[in-house]
């Protein structure tokens, strides 16, 4: 028996291991692990009867809901669902991860149903996009106040910052952006939060994608100001063509969008990196400038242009860890990319941490939580906007993985000697012609992160790999064990196969042209019908006295129903 093991099984096992080792990373090296997935979104209604009534009345239309933002805190995973179409019962929701470890959980309105009533400007949130939890346990949510998308957009409410205490689940502040901070084209879908010396020394930065501006908000002053019309906020006219999931479309007007913040530098400030959506380039500015209201009209040369990331490098979401690793979505490549901020900003310093031509079609949001775990939401957004999703297929996914696992053996993994950064990477502040530069450089990273990364034992280092920018296209191979997706329906290598019928035009499912990436915010003062399809009619009696289903349930506020969502 032992002789047979040595002469037959072990050599065969060795050959198997060699064969597995030769499988390309694009086929088998799935680092992100699928945590949740849905064919279509479902919501945690107070009871089955109210859900049935909402379906019958059109207050809940499952196929109209698209998740766009994700954020993690404790045992909750927050998911935002904008009100682009009718039938979205809640825009700010969460998953109780203690109750739903995996699967397709119902989304629970946060903090309750009442706070998700569309058009109730002072008390509720109409539409939320991307959100941020800060290190002080606060959830920052910008309510765009909009309902609809493209030419169907109305503005029942003004832009307002809503901040929640995640310990008490109460809103602790609401701040409306003044008229001076917006313009007729304003559309804001991204937020970055900057915590300084303490929790009161907090700023939030908002990217105005279509109004081409950057807005700063001070928690301590409870005041905001706008940096307007810098040329770096505008789209690149050569980068407005997109190809996702077999659909060719143009988002040529999309300006400043994704943002990330570095760790605090030696001068006490951070660097804000940002990119227009229609661009392959990244830009930077010190928060020393953004925190100073007096610099809104005198800061042009404080903004710095970096190189392009490489081809097919449109991005909508970016985030940086506290040790300087930036992650970002690559929507053209069905991938998540990385760059270590101690290295030059060049294509050679960028890498792919994971890619999936099925599961990561439009990775809409990327976040790093307090435990250095990465969360990625993919939603097939262009198919939803410009064609039709196949709701018998999995359309929405949330993935997760430790940050260290994702960057291992990439150009961003400085534990690997093959990718050592130069001693100093510095971009000095640019001075206006005829003037000398003053103040500290924009950033100076003299191996400031290497000491942190090198604390891990040598045995954790990955093998030396050749430098490469991007991995090749995913080649479907249903025979690979451990694949996180069912690849049985994949076609030829590199071919994206889907049962979704896609087109190359920019016409939505109802024949409405949708030339924009998201809502085109007109601020056009249109009156909003309170009895229309997006709002629940105002009803005074308690739910027990009425039979109007969810519409009644939401508006009978004196009953305190929202404190008991799980009854029934």
From Swiss-Prot:
It holds the Pfam family MRJP. GO terms for cellular component: extracellular region. It comes from Drosophila madeirensis (Fruit fly). Keywords: Developmental protein, Glycoprotein, Secreted, Signal. Controls the pigmentation pattern of the adult cuticle and larval mouth parts. Residues 1-28 form the signal peptide. This is Protein yellow. The keyword Iron does not apply. Its main location: secreted. It is found in: Secreted. InterPro entries: 6-blade_b-propeller_TolB-like, Royal_jelly/protein_yellow. Belongs to the major royal jelly protein family. Glycans are attached at residues 151, 222. PANTHER family: PROTEIN YELLOW, PROTEIN YELLOW-RELATED.
